[in-house]
Regions:
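Tryptophan-anchored aromatic micro-motifs
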Residues: 1-19, 87-94, 107-110
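Short, solvent-exposed coil/turn segments at beta-strand boundaries
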Residues: 2-5, 26-32, 50-55, 80-85, ...
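N-terminal first-folded block
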Residues: 7-40
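Short hydrophobic/aromatic-rich beta-strand segments that constitute the beta-sheet cores
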Residues: 9-11, 32-35, 56-60, 86-91
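Short, surface-exposed coil-to-beta transition loops
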Residues: 18-22, 41-46, 69-75, 87, ...
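Short, solvent-exposed aromatic-acidic interface loops
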Residues: 38-42, 62-66, 91-98
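Mid-chain, well-packed structural core segment of small domains
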Residues: 51-87
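C-terminal structural segments of small proteins and small subunits
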Residues: 80-103
């Protein structure tokens, strides 16, 4: 199992001002949680469980820069890059305020 504790991840897409949210992950056994901020995200909290293959199944709540709140769920599947860092392929579904779904990628950063 991948140990996500202390790892930081940044979205591969940037906002209009060139910034992107950065998340710091924590792990105890199969329990994983993270907090994120940056770009269009004022604050985001994530919590979920990690499967033996490193896949994380989590829920999230966030406050966006415009003051909207959003809640949803995400399944993050890891891939190890050539340089040893982790890339997470995220399939997400947002419930409110504008329901939607999509795919994003976040990569391990220092």
């Amino acid at each position: 199992m991948i140990n996500y504790d202390g790892k930081r991840f940044r979205n591969t897409e940037r906002s209009a001002d060139g910034t992107a949210p950065v998340a710091t992950y924590h792990q105890a056994g199969d329990l994983v949680w993270a907090e994120a901020a940056g770009g269009d995200v004022r604050r985001c909290m994530l919590v979920g469980v990690c499967d033996p293959d490193g896949t994380i199944r989590m829920g999230y709540t966030m406050v966006l820069a415009n003051g909207e709140t959003a809640i949803g769920r995400c399944v993050s599947t890891p891939r190890t890059l050539d340089d040893g860092r982790i890339l997470l392929h995220e399939e997400w579904e947002r419930y409110q305020p504008r329901p939607g779904s999509g795919v994003s990628f976040i990569e391990e950063t220092e």
